[in-house]
Structures are given as C-alpha cells and as structure tokens.
C-alpha cells in the first residue's frame, strides 16, 4: 500500500489520542463510522457512532475525567492494508487515570482497529481493546 494512505490511517489514530486526552467525546465519536462496533476491555459492545460518543462523554465527564492515553497510537501502530480502502491497525498502549505519561499498572492494552475509507476519509469501523495480562494468572 502507498505511504500516503498509511500516513492518513496513523493520523486518525493520533486524532483519537488527542480527542481522548482532551476529553472531547464529540471529536472522539467523529472518528468512527456510523455503524462502528466498539468493544471495551471488559467485553461491552457499543454499536454505532452515537453510542460510542455518548458512552465516552459519560466517561470523560465522570470516572475518566483528566485521564490520558500514553504514547502515540498512530506512531506505534502496526498497519496493514486488507484492500486499498480497508486497513487493520494493532497497537499496544495504555492509559493513566492521573494524566501521567506512563500507563497506570494494570491499564496496559493491545488495541485492534479496522479502518475503512468512506467519502474520501479514513474512519474506524471496528475497535477491540484487550487488557494485557499474565496468562499464568
């Protein structure tokens, strides 16, 4: 795949980080397709842009107020193109509830994204967040 498309995909992930770090649920939601699926680390599914935005508004105004995603999602992601208009990105990252630059213990995740090019722009159509844990318990 061409480098410009990969740069655009990485840019979406960086804008996602910026929206989270700003607590901007509307900007966060705009990065998803209307029919996106958003699966949280605990298995809940928020289907559709509206549900993704409203759930994040509640989080950003409540328990995740002031939280930060650590690192650069776009910079760290492994990106591959399934077709010219569909990309998969996988990235390790984490979050800090105190706004620190390093993830809080137990808040490291591996996140998988499927992005689709719609109307000339890349949007996230599927999101899966999985907490990193020791398989030995």
Predicted regions and their residues:
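A solvent-exposed, acidic/Ser-Thr-rich amphipathic alpha-helical stretch
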Residues: 25-87, 91-92, 105-106
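Hydrophobic alpha-helical segments of small multi-pass membrane proteins
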Residues: 77, 93-95, 110-114
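Charge-dense, low-complexity intrinsically disordered segments
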Residues: 3, 7, 46, 102
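Short, cysteine-centered beta-strand-loop-beta hairpins and adjacent loop/turn segments enriched
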Residues: 95-105
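Short, conserved clusters of charged catalytic residues that mark active-site
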Residues: 11-12, 71-74, 110
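A generic structural motif
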Residues: 39, 96-98, 116
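Short beta-strand edge/turn micro-motifs at domain boundaries
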Residues: 106-137
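Short, low-complexity N-terminal intrinsically disordered segments enriched in polar/charged residues
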Residues: 1-34, 123, 135-136
């Amino acid at each position: 795949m061409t480098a410009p498309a990969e740069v655009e995909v990485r840019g979406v992930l960086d804008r996602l980080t910026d929206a989270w770090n700003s607590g901007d649920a509307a900007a966060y939601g705009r990065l998803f397709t209307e029919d996106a699926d958003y699966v949280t680390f605990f298995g809940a599914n928020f289907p559709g842009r509206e549900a993704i935005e409203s759930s994040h508004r509640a989080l950003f105004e409540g328990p995740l107020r002031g939280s930060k995603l650590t690192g650069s999602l776009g910079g760290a992601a492994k990106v591959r193109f399934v077709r010219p208009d569909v990309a998969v990105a996988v990235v390790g990252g984490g979050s800090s509830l105190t706004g620190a630059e390093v993830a809080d213990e137990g808040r490291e995740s591996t996140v998988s994204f499927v992005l689709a090019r719609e109307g000339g722009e890349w949007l996230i159509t599927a999101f899966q967040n999985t907490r990193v844990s020791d398989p030995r318990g």
